[in-house]
Amino acid sequence: MPAAPHPVEIWTLTLCNLGRRPRRLSVFALAELSLLTDVSLYGHASYLHGIKLARSHGVAARKVGMNLPNPYYSAIFLSSRRPTSWEANLNAFKGQFRTLANPIALARGRCCGGISSRDPVGAVLHFQLRLAPGASPRTDFLVGAADVFKVEAEASRYVRNYLQSGSLADDHFARMRGTDEVDVLRRGRWERQ
C-alpha cells in the first residue's frame, strides 16, 4: 500500500471455489502483537494485555506502562468481515504443550474468545465461510499502530478509511493488486492456479 496518513498495513485474502459443489472452509488469521522494542523494558508482560474490538471486528494489544514516552504502544488487527470466533491470548490459541504448527483452536474448530493479561497477545480471527460454486469472497485485514488511550476510536477510523467499501484503500488496491499462484491437488494431479 502506498504511504498513508496512518501507520497501517493491509492484506487481502480472496478464496475461490473453482469446483462444482459448494464448499465450507474454516479460516484462521493470526497476527502476533508482541509490542517488544529494542529498549530493555523491565516487566514488559506486566503492562501488556489483549482486548476484543467488537465494533471493528478485531483484536488489540495494549501496553500501558508507567512513564511511557510513546503513545503508540498499542497494535491492532482488524478485518473487513465479522469473525465467527476470536482470541487475544496466544497461549490459549496454541494450547498447553502445543505450537503454532498444531494449535488446539484448530483441533476444536474455533477460538474461545479469551482476552490476554500478561500473556503473549495473539490476535486470532476465525471465519467459517461457505463458498458457492464460482464464488470468491474477499476479506481485507489491517495491522496497525494506535494511540494506547484511543484504541477503539482509532480502530473505528481505520475501518472507515481502509476496510469499508469505497474506502481510501479500494482505489490503491485496484491499481496495484496482484495475484499469487498456488499449487492445488485436483483429480490426483497438481495444478498451478
Regions inferred by a protein language model and the residue ranges of each:
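Glycine-centered flexibility motif
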Residues: 95, 99, 113, 119-120, ...
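Polysaccharide-binding surfaces and accessory modules of carbohydrate-active proteins
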Residues: 1-108, 155-184
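Short Pro-Gly-centered flexible turn/kink motifs
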Residues: 23, 129-147
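Short beta-strand and strand-turn-strand segments in soluble, beta-rich domains
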Residues: 40-46, 115-125
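Short, Lys/Arg- and Gly-enriched loop/turn segments at beta-strand edges
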Residues: 145-155
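Beta-strand-rich interaction surfaces with strong enrichment in secreted/lumenal proteins
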Residues: 1, 112-116, 126-131
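Residue-level preference for beta-strand/loop junctions
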Residues: 7, 121-123, 135
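Substrate-binding groove/exosite segments of carbohydrate-active enzymes
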Residues: 118-121, 181-193
